[in-house]
From Swiss-Prot:
It is linked to Witteveen-Kolk syndrome: An autosomal dominant syndrome characterized by global developmental delay, mild to severe intellectual disability, and facial dysmorphism. Additional features include short stature, microcephaly, joint hypermotility, and small hands and feet with digital abnormalities. Brain imaging shows dilated ventricles, thin corpus callosum and, in some cases, dysgyria or polymicrogyria. SUMO1 sumoylated by TOPORS. Probably desumoylated by SENP2. Residues 205-480 are annotated as: Interaction with REST. Keywords: Acetylation, Biological rhythms, Coiled coil, Disease variant, Dwarfism, Intellectual disability, Isopeptide bond, Nucleus, Phosphoprotein, Repeat, Repressor, Transcription, Transcription regulation, Ubl conjugation. PANTHER family: PAIRED AMPHIPATHIC HELIX PROTEIN SIN3A (PTHR12346:SF2), SIN3B-RELATED (PTHR12346). This is Paired amphipathic helix protein Sin3a. It comes from Homo sapiens. Residues 888-967 are annotated as: Interaction with OGT. It is found in: Nucleus; Nucleus, Nucleolus.
Amino acid sequence: MKRRLDDQESPVYAAQQRRIPGSTEAFPHQHRVLAPAPPVYEAVSETMQSATGIQYSVTPSYQVSAMPQSSGSHGPAIAAVHSSHHHPTAVQPHGGQVVQSHAHPAPPVAPVQGQQQFQRLKVEDALSYLDQVKLQFGSQPQVYNDFLDIMKEFKSQSIDTPGVISRVSQLFKGHPDLIMGFNTFLPPGYKIEVQTNDMVNVTTPGQVHQIPTHGIQPQPQPPPQHPSQPSAQSAPAPAQPAPQPPPAKVSKPSQLQAHTPASQQTPPLPPYASPRSPPVQPHTPVTISLGTAPSLQNNQPVEFNHAINYVNKIKNRFQGQPDIYKAFLEILHTYQKEQRNAKEAGGNYTPALTEQEVYAQVARLFKNQEDLLSEFGQFLPDANSSVLLSKTTAEKVDSVRNDHGGTVKKPQLNNKPQRPSQNGCQIRRHPTGTTPPVKKKPKLLNLKDSSMADASKHGGGTESLFFDKVRKALRSAEAYENFLRCLVIFNQEVISRAELVQLVSPFLGKFPELFNWFKNFLGYKESVHLETYPKERATEGIAMEIDYASCKRLGSSYRALPKSYQQPKCTGRTPLCKEVLNDTWVSFPSWSEDSTFVSSKKTQYEEHIYRCEDERFELDVVLETNLATIRVLEAIQKKLSRLSAEEQAKFRLDNTLGGTSEVIHRKALQRIYADKAADIIDGLRKNPSIAVPIVLKRLKMKEEEWREAQRGFNKVWREQNEKYYLKSLDHQGINFKQNDTKVLRSKSLLNEIESIYDERQEQATEENAGVPVGPHLSLAYEDKQILEDAAALIIHHVKRQTGIQKEDKYKIKQIMHHFIPDLLFAQRGDLSDVEEEEEEEMDVDEATGAVKKHNGVGGSPPKSKLLFSNTAAQKLRGMDEVYNLFYVNNNWYIFMRLHQILCLRLLRICSQAERQIEEENREREWEREVLGIKRDKSDSPAIQLRLKEPMDVDVEDYYPAFLDMVRSLLDGNIDSSQYEDSLREMFTIHAYIAFTMDKLIQSIVRQLQHIVSDEICVQVTDLYLAENNNGATGGQLNTQNSRSLLESTYQRKAEQLMSDENCFKLMFIQSQGQVQLTIELLDTEEENSDDPVEAERWSDYVERYMNSDTTSPELREHLAQKPVFLPRNLRRIRKCQRGREQQEKEGKEGNSKKTMENVDSLDKLECRFKLNSYKMVYVIKSEDYMYRRTALLRAHQSHERVSKRLHQRFQAWVDKWTKEHVPREMAAETSKWLMGEGLEGLVPCTTTCDTETLHFVSINKYRVKYGTVFKAP
């Protein structure tokens, strides 16, 4: 089973990676569940130095069944034990793997007894276990994700080891093999055992707990009374653990205490103590293998994801340099093979590749990549220490050198403790035995305590002697401290190497010997003026590790760098640069090759064009390089021809061979002479008089050979460009054909409208409202002229179908030429068979003399066979605001959808042809007016330059030629590729819409065949014709409600007819010259009431309501006894009835019709009934109105007269009432009050009374103007 490493990492580290192109291949070595050789451990006794150790073997006792073998191949990675490790530990390498162990004091008699023994883990163990989890829970991915979350929480120290055991046991309930297999990753002293009753026994250092798999809290049990030595399978630990040493203190940011005195002991923690609470933690060793990167500086636990992270980081960093990545894999593979051979030989074999050599090779491979090399150094800490010791470089000397390729960290310019870098911290042993503890937070800016001993404490040799000489030479402690400050700011990359030399020149300038040694030590050269910081070179690939998708956005092309990103230093910036230059926003391009959208990727034809251009460019570079070398050597040859023989013998060339570039000529010669190029170049420099003519002849010969090849390639490239140019521009054609075939399927068209219908139903149910009424689809027929072209193509294909009967062909012809134009308010087509008479042959049967025709009908049948001779839709063609109504089944619906798509695509091609005609005319007009050139249609520049073949079709004939090509494609006279190429030549990138024209027409013909042959389809057509005679299939929109009863009857009949399939309501609406087709899927499922009595009552109610004669004799009798009408209304009704009777007697029916012609009415008032209460509710925005056209004019004319008469009647009533009820004194007081007089306490004001006329009536208008109110003091 092959595995991608990033698959294992992505659930936990999804936010840390941006994108890994392709699969992250595993390292090429055989996957093994367990190491074949016994693991080798180290024990440190109290009498030993930390750099030495005793090696001994322990027979492994692994549970092989818990870790099934996998056949996948993976690279070296961490197999980390998830433990609560909170104090630094000594690291000692051995062979190919580093096993970390803590030594505790023990009696001298048994130095080995009491040592913590544990197994060696590899990344293969962890990945195999994950494989088993995936396989076991393949249908439950959440379980796998929960397991990774548990591991992530443990890594962040959110839970302790017992908590992990409890959660894993609960998660893998019912899978004892997985629970037991987790023992492989537990620290010594912990063990899980599954009982038969689903109880889980957990052995911890000092106690045994039982955990039921249903999640009950652990129950402590007495510890075992017989201490036993733990095996590699994490056997139970002794009841009394060994005393623990105190936490080691960090003496330097990158150093780790290797050993502490055994006399200092602290009691162990309880087994279930939190890992965060006390400073002293229980002893939990950590197992590290090759490829391990534990973050030990912050005392964080280790897990195998770190190794996978590191592998992915390397591959991302060297994406453009796959050779480096492959070389790295080869180094690890070779080292692992050597270690395997050494183990199998049992100590009789000495590995050819040691850890130091592995580190040195990787260091050369990852030069200038400080972070990668530093992190790799964590996997080989002793090799790293050996390299550092071999260099014998003090810490501050390393800072001076600014060598970022090693693992030495620079001091920080703050008083805070050094934090781990982005890629992990680094571990380095002190070269001597033990170091007294120092402060954890060194104040690095305080340089007053700096001394030569501090500077050279970890180094020796000439570097230490140099600092001693500098201190003695400067004599002043302050000057020496300032010198050290210069080194510190250089170490922080605040200044460059050249600036450092300038800063220390006042100190060392007086001592040339020291100054020269210092510059040589820095690698400083006088000619180097511009320098690239190693830190910047080391972080070239950091951009690949930033997750830009989660960063702040500015538009679609820019992302803001995270605040945690460390900006590179720049010493050349001025304050103005810092103010105006951008350090936050970075460009975030979206490459077409990396895009997940198919439409944005390059097509195969674009790739062909690009490949041609790449090949052309590459050959041009070869030719121009060769030509440049020829010119240089020709100049040298001319120069030599003017020299004497002695001068020629003395003449020499430099590395540029007489030119200006060394690289160009060297590449040209290497291309020809390959491995012998170095000898040729050496001969040209030392003896040009002999070598130049020979090399020049060879170069010219190659020039002719390559020029000839270029001419041959130009023909090939031109053919490929001509073949793929138009196809490369068409980025939609490839996907369009495949997708359009799916869209045109009957099932897709039905699913489209059914999904819209279901969405409406669900929305109405959620909102607890009625289902909205209206069409589900609205389609447009923009040009009626296209209907003729569509009908011609369809009939053309129908005639050539031998499976369709003669009568059915004629019915289809009538539908396309008569019925469809009537529905769409277009002019009918001609049924004459002129085309058939011209194309088809007449076969005379000699025996009977009968006339036969192939693939068609033998002439137009008599008029009696016409299906659509006279329809009401014909009369609506020239009118506006009209509609046609047609209830159809599935076949008719699919046909109308396909027909609309066909008309739409024909219209787009026709419109494009018209646009190209206009562009051609404008171009000719411009050439004639501006350039004074008058050219023919076929005299385009491309044709004259023979870059394009002249076309047989003029631009004006593009659309007719397109229709002819469609007919030829339907007949099989041309293939689809030729058809598509011709379309691209005519319509360029707009031609893709017609690529599936043949499939579309074939689908239409299949539906037409069903329409004329299927029984239900024929009945649908017959029902339309029958209801058309009754006036129920359309008319004017403003009189639609007058036909509502007829249309409802038509709908009920259609629903009954199509009870077994969908029923669609098609409305063809013509408004302002545009034809719109609306389609509504009707709900034909009848809701049967549970109570038959209620159903009967509802039916009776509807019938009585719809009946015009709703007044029963009983109701009339009841109303006569107890009238509920106003007498005046009864009088008006009787008067109208008498007037109607009188008109009928006088026979004035003609005048009545004439009177009704001058009336405008709208009957669109709608109402709904609530089934529960029979309550009628009017629909919003529905209304009725009726008025005579002369009523408004008559109202204007009589308005004044009527207004005066009404006012006089009202005024007479008011005067009469006032005379009876209002005395004169009250009327006088009212007049005074209106004028602001007569009453005290009124606000001072001035009132005026003016007489105005409003609506032909005189009125009094009072205006009040208030004065200022003065208050008494």
